[in-house]
Structures are given as structure tokens and as C-alpha cells.
Amino acid sequence: MSFKFGKNSEKQLATVKPELQKVARRALELSPYDFTIVQGIRTVAQSAQNIANGTSFLKDPSKSKHITGDAIDFAPYINGKIDWNDLEAFWAVKKAFEQAGKELGIKLRFGADWNASGDYHDEIKRGTYDGGHVELV
């Protein structure tokens, strides 16, 4: 099946580095699920707010890769909606990003697997799971 980014995803993609845009476009071609780009670049203030809200485990908001356009957040878009609890769908899209990065020779790190163990369950146990986060290394 062929998917296409919508206006909001394109707007978010336009804020990040070209390498990350390429990877996201290739991942969309490879993914078994449609997905949306929830966020590209963000400010230090937005990062600080995410920390305050408990949606970021960073201690220093200036360390976010989103600030420099080196990160995006995606979410699978299935049957017309995002199911934030469908961790298997997030993992499947993460695998598409992983394959896209390999094909394009672009190194990535994933919030679903910070330690590159090949499993997201350990990230959940540590409280560091960020399933839709992809960043350039």
C-alpha cells in the first residue's frame, strides 16, 4: 500500500534537516502502517514544557535534538486515528525507519530502543520509552 504525508506532516518535516526528511519519506514507503509526523523542530521553551508535563525524561531542555532539527516524533495513523497505546504499530514504523536509515546510509537513534537492544520492553521498564522519537546520530 502506498501512503502519502498530509499537510501537517509536510509542515513538520520542513522544519528538520534534509537527511531526516529523506529517511521519513523512505520509511513511509516501507512502513506497513500510515503514520503522521507529530513534531519536528521545537524551541527550548517547548522542550522545558514537555519536561514539566512529564512527556520528556530529559533533565536539560537545551539537550533536545528537536531544537536543532535533528529529531522528529511520528505516530502510526490507523483507521483514521492515532492509537498511542498500540506499541506494536509504533515498533513496526520504527523498523521501517531503521530500514530506511540503513538503505540511505543515515545513522539514527530511536526512542523506542535507546540502548539498541532490539526490544522496547526494557525502555518501558526504565521509564525511557519514547516510541515515536527518531533522531540523527
UniProtKB/Swiss-Prot annotation:
Top EC class for this record: hydrolase
pH-activity note: Optimum pH is 8.5.
GO molecular function: metal ion binding; peptidase activity
Known cofactor(s): Zn(2+)
Binding residues for Zn(2+): 66, 73, 133
UniProt keyword annotation of Zinc present: yes
Protein name (database record): L-alanyl-D-glutamate peptidase
Organism of provenance: Escherichia phage T5
